[in-house]
């Protein structure tokens, strides 16, 4: 993938860029693997906003992605197409299995039309192949990693992301996450070899607010520019700092949203670096 820059023909196009979509080989998805996707606009069943800054955007159809691949061990598949998916930053690959079934997977970097991929403990260590962690050598870059055996891929699924397998000890493998966190995962969990493609996604300059609206993202307004009735930081004469430590619109202190006693914390060997210091 490469980035194509627009000429500054309008203020919205000045500095804006877009993917050249050179790796895309098909413009329409496989009909049997598409499901309708109903936009909620950040509302719950009562119509109340539960997630702010969401709504609008272009209509999408959901592509059914195979995040497990454990029922196709030993069955080779040919990459029929590399396709665009509006629901994620990564590209997706349409696989045609030898038994006639078709499935989508996340397209890793280097996978192209016509390649053959496989899954199972005896699969080769090459991009696109899916194996249990116990069968992958240390130092390998992987993506689409399970947190629990058979639970489906949960980690490293976005464009350009990857996890490094540092080593294996007893029934656990040590993984270095994209955040820098080192975590232990059961060696029976499966992962796909390689890093996710479309890494240049992070370098796209969206150029104007309207392109964010096309993606279904609404404006995020700072509390200090609101009125006191709308936010604890609002009001005051002239430009103010908010007058207190940062809080949410409902008065909750900023940050510290995670459960300190989460049961899976025991699998974290080294925490990610957040750049923040919280006193408890």
Curated annotation (Swiss-Prot):
The UniProt regions of compositional bias labelled Basic residues, in chain numbering, are 37-59, 268-280
Q: Can you list the GO cellular component terms from the UniProt entry?
A: large ribosomal subunit
Q: Output the GO biological process annotations, alphabetical, semicolon-separated.
A: cytoplasmic translation
Segments carrying the region annotation (Disordered) are 27-59, 225-280
The record, for InterPro entries, names:
NA-bd_OB-fold, Rib_uL2_dom2, Ribosomal_uL2, Ribosomal_uL2_bac/org-type, Ribosomal_uL2_C, Ribosomal_uL2_CS, Ribosomal_uL2_dom3, Ribosomal_uL2_RNA-bd_dom
UniProt keywords (A-Z) are: Ribonucleoprotein, Ribosomal protein, RNA-binding, rRNA-binding
Top-level lineage group? Bacteria
Q: Which SUPFAM superfamilies match?
A: Nucleic acid-binding proteins, Translation proteins SH3-like domain
List membrane-spanning regions: none
Recorded GO MF terms: rRNA binding; structural constituent of ribosome; transferase activity
Quaternary organization: Part of the 50S ribosomal subunit. Forms a bridge to the 30S subunit in the 70S ribosome.
Report the function annotation for this chain: One of the primary rRNA binding proteins. Required for association of the 30S and 50S subunits to form the 70S ribosome, for tRNA binding and peptide bond formation. It has been suggested to have peptidyltransferase activity; this is somewhat controversial. Makes several contacts with the 16S rRNA in the 70S ribosome.
Family listed: Belongs to the universal ribosomal protein uL2 family.
Q: Which PANTHER family match?
A: LARGE RIBOSOMAL SUBUNIT PROTEIN UL2M, RIBOSOMAL PROTEIN L2
Please identify the protein, giving its name as recorded: Large ribosomal subunit protein uL2
